């Protein structure tokens, strides 16, 4: 069991290093792997509240706030007030965030190839 946990940890670490390097190579400096979880949620849903995002990525609202603040600062998303309820704020992708989807998918595809390259089709399922 210990060896399995060690292996999973090494795979996670190597995957994160790959993602960070690819983000940098594609001009997305400042982004980190944990930002990807939020982007995935927003690629699936056009607008979400902080609570919705927290539920989507299984993180606390304070953690989501820090991640969203950084993504907003980098220009990938913005906050919009609800037309129906001014107390409600939605998080939405900017054009930069929408355009980044192509790069995001490319990096994800490369990561999957790297992770599954030595596995048979049966093992990868």
Predicted regions and their residues:
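Long, contiguous secondary-structure blocks with strong helical propensity
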Residues: 7, 60, 66-74
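Charged, amphipathic alpha-helical coiled-coil/dimerization segments
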Residues: 69-125
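N-terminal leader segment of winged-helix/HTH proteins
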Residues: 1-29
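N-terminal positioning helix adjacent to the helix-turn-helix/winged-helix DNA-binding module
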Residues: 4, 34-35, 96, 123
